């Protein structure tokens, strides 16, 4: 009887354990049956764990004969990414001369605008609510509406005198169940943008050493952000914020922004540095070649020869 009560309570709350989430989200993404061995490989869990979790999910009626059910899809709903915010307001000073007349996210690489790859990855993950925070040469972003009529624009009038926290200020009520992107990342593996997230997370690349912004990670959770480090995780400007954290961020961003020196902050310093007691942000691994950051005109010429004239 106790078991039944526990199961009923879990169903009412619709909270999944981490392992249940891992297996269920794989089944939802794969659109077919997978052997338990395949589930183990994809989830990183042992065969024994997969077997036990599949039994739990079957009892909860989230899985039938190895396939996810309608109830299983519903159970994943609180974990689904519902919107995406693109921070695209800045002047890409290091990419001059190109950025004198084109905002960096609209620069074309091999004929495609940088931001298009990110937007396409969102659409593939079922994320159709898309906001772009714009500032520098704002009207140029209108061209995106021909291809992506669902886009909504948020205006950042102070992009020139403040850091990207000013863009987060403009978008601060849209941060629940939301991806936040730096809009100038060239994505080469769209699969890293996933539909379901168990908790808030930040993409990063495991590094022996880096001179870049990086995270110190303990038990999968980011405990420190700094510039340069050994045995750390190099930050990639793509993060996801669950519903609860999104609500907290709307207050914390405003509070940080309004403090002395607040306008000079990077937006992610709010949850990772200044208000880090309020958050537990996990690191989500991606590989070196999943994302290409083009920081300088020289790097752009190396990637796309048409600029090398």
Regions found by a protein language model. Give the residues of each.
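Short, Lys/Arg-enriched N-terminal segments with co-localized hydrophobic residues
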Residues: 1-11
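Short amphipathic alpha-helical interface segments
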Residues: 13-42
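Conserved core of the sugar-phosphate nucleotidyltransferase
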Residues: 22, 189-261
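N-terminal glycine-rich phosphate-binding loop and ensuing alpha1 helix
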Residues: 24-27, 74-134, 138
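Conserved alpha/beta core of the MobA/IspD/sugar-nucleotide pyrophosphorylase nucleotidyltransferase superfamily
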Residues: 28, 67-69, 73-84, 235-309
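Short amphipathic alpha-helical interaction segments
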Residues: 44-56
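A short, conserved structural fragment
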Residues: 58-67
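Conserved beta-loop-beta/alpha segment of the NTase-like Rossmann-fold superfamily
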Residues: 141-213
